[in-house]
UniProtKB/Swiss-Prot annotation:
UniProt keyword Protease present: yes
Activity: how regulated: CASP8 activity is restricted by RIPK1. Inhibited by the effector protein NleF that is produced by pathogenic E.coli; this inhibits apoptosis.
Gene Ontology CC terms: CD95 death-inducing signaling complex; cell body; cytoplasm; cytoskeleton; cytosol; death-inducing signaling complex; lamellipodium; mitochondrial outer membrane
SUPFAM superfamilies xrefs: Caspase-like, DEATH domain
Effect listed in the UniProt record for changing residue 360 to A: Does not affect localization to lamellipodia of migrating cells. Prevents DISC-mediated processing of CASP8
Cleavage (site feature) positions: 216-217, 374-375, 384-385
Protein name: Caspase-8
All residue ranges annotated as the DED domain in the record: 2-80, 100-177
Record PTM text: Generation of the p10 and p18 subunits requires association with the death-inducing signaling complex (DISC), whereas additional processing is likely due to the autocatalytic activity of the activated protease. GZMB and CASP10 can be involved in these processing events.
Length: 479
């Protein structure tokens, strides 16, 4: 069943109370003023899509919403996710996208009876005028009104506690549990990065193009270095797709997609480079999407306890946010990287998971000074286009993704030389790893080298962009 049909079917089965709950739990992403026009679940889904909180390749927020409002039937039927899976997922720190504060308020609203709701309104008359507390207001509406008046917030729970104590002391336990959780979380986040062995920090996804101020705020977590002593350091998968005859035959929109001539040069460069850096190379050529998932599943289930790192390189065609298998089927990049979260691959928890992706993803040019492209008209260079704000890696520590290009811009492949990105990456790794440079320093140099190349025919340029949630410096010793 396709993505839109799934959302439609889910929306049709959510009543007005469900919608009110979903809107409340989404307040940190869609402000109350912008929620006012939302009259049904489909409109809410549309707003979430606009905020990039709901995508075909990333249903985690929708799953969490349905789990929180206890619509487990929809979770199982349409999203193929069981309650136990969600419980395990949300127990991993940093994975929950709905704040503990908002979940706490929602839990209170679920425990308050109609008579207690009337008492709630009566006891708040000093803080909120009676005309605002009309008969139709539910407790979630009251919480929103309290937040507007700044008498309720993550650090403002006194009035709520006073009212709950008068109405039903069991409600206080929900608040106390939240406060205890907040204290534990605060104290744990003040600890050393070494205290987290399985990606358990609350971490944001960063890119090298983030502002200096944002990077400075994270710099302390990079002061230490990931352990890199095992030999081999880890597995290095190289999924190298060249022959797209199946795609041309089976997928009408890809009838003119070209074979990726020259990709063997990239695969060879990656093999030589990472062998020198003591990785065990695992090559896989001309893989369908199903085969790619099967390969990743094999390495997800492997025991990496004696390894210090994992690398996966994918060389293929693609489109916005996805890569193509040789059969023309699509694999969302986020789904590929997410195969190696701490929950799915515990033996890699706390260890760096590195992905390098060279994939043709469109036909737009980044304007600059004027090489040719491996599109239908040009036989030489491949064009990569990424979707704006597309999510590529999990919101979990220890991931790094090197994409060949920034959003909405092409990348280039020369059949006689390989791609600008992979060739520059391998050259920089071979030159700078023996000096002890860390991977972000190296990728910054790759950005510089690639950005100085010109596509003179199309006036195009290319700028790679890494995205990462690394907690420490990542160095690949050559000795």
């Amino acid at each position: 069943m396709d993505f839109s049909r799934n959302l439609y079917d889910i929306g049709e089965q959510l009543d007005s109370e469900d919608l009110a709950s979903l809107k409340f739990l989404s307040l940190d992403y869609i402000p109350q003023r912008k929620q006012e026009p939302i009259k049904d679940a489909l409109m809410l889904f549309q707003r979430l899509q606009e905020k990039r909180m709901l995508e075909e390749s990333n249903l985690s927020f929708l799953k969490e919403l349905l789990f929180r409002i206890n619509r487990l039937d929809l979770l199982i039927t349409y999203l193929n996710t069981r309650k136990e899976e969600m419980e395990r997922e949300l127990q991993t720190p940093g994975r929950a996208q709905i704040s503990a504060y908002r979940v706490m308020l929602y839990q209170i609203s679920e425990e308050v009876s109609r008579s207690e709701l009337r008492s709630f309104k009566f006891l708040l008359q000093e803080e909120i005028s009676k005309c605002k507390l009309d008969d139709d207001m539910n407790l979630l509406d009251i919480f929103i009104e309290m937040e507007k008046r700044v008498i309720l917030g993550e650090g403002k729970l006194d009035i709520l506690k006073r009212v709950c104590a008068q109405i039903n002391k069991s409600l206080l336990k929900i608040i106390n549990d939240y406060e205890e959780f907040s204290k534990e979380r605060s104290s744990s986040l003040e600890g050393s990065p070494d205290e987290f062995s399985n990606g358990e920090e609350l971490c944001g996804v960063m890119t090298i193009s983030d502002s200096p101020r944002e990077q400075d705020s994270e710099s302390q977590t990079l002061d230490k270095v990931y352990q890199m002593k095992s030999k081999p350091r880890g597995y290095c998968l190289i999924i190298n797709n060249h022959n797209f005859a199946k795609a041309r035959e089976k997928v009408p929109k890809l009838h003119s997609i070209r074979d990726r001539n020259g990709t063997h040069l990239d695969a060879g460069a990656l093999t030589t480079t990472f062998e020198e850096l003591h990785f065990e190379i695992k090559p896989h050529d001309d893989c369908t999407v199903e085969q790619i998932y099967e390969i990743l599943k094999i390495y997800q289930l492997m025991d990496h306890s004696n390894m210090d790192c994992f690398i996966c390189c994918i060389l293929s065609h693609g489109d916005k946010g996805i890569i193509y298998g040789t059969d023309g089927q699509e694999a969302p990049i986020y789904e590929l990287t997410s195969q190696f979260t701490g929950l799915k691959c515990p033996s890699l928890a706390g260890k760096p998971k590195v992905f390098f992706i060279q994939a043709c993803q469109g036909d737009n040019y980044q304007k600059g000074i004027p090489v040719e492209t491996d599109s239908e008209e040009q036989p030489y260079l491949e064009m990569d286009l990424s979707s704006p704000q597309t999510r590529y890696i999990p919101d979990e520590a220890d991931f790094l993704l090197g994409m060949a290009t920034v959003n909405n811009c092409v990348s280039y492949r020369n059949p006689a030389e390989g791609t600008w990105y992979i060739q520059s990456l391998c050259q920089s790794l071979r030159e700078r790893c023996p000096r002890g440079d860390d991977i972000l320093t190296i990728l910054t140099e790759v950005n510089y080298e690639v950005s100085n190349k010109d596509d003179k025919k199309n006036m195009g340029k290319q700028m790679p962009q890494p995205t990462f949630t690394l907690r420490k410096k990542l160095v690949f010793p050559s000795d």
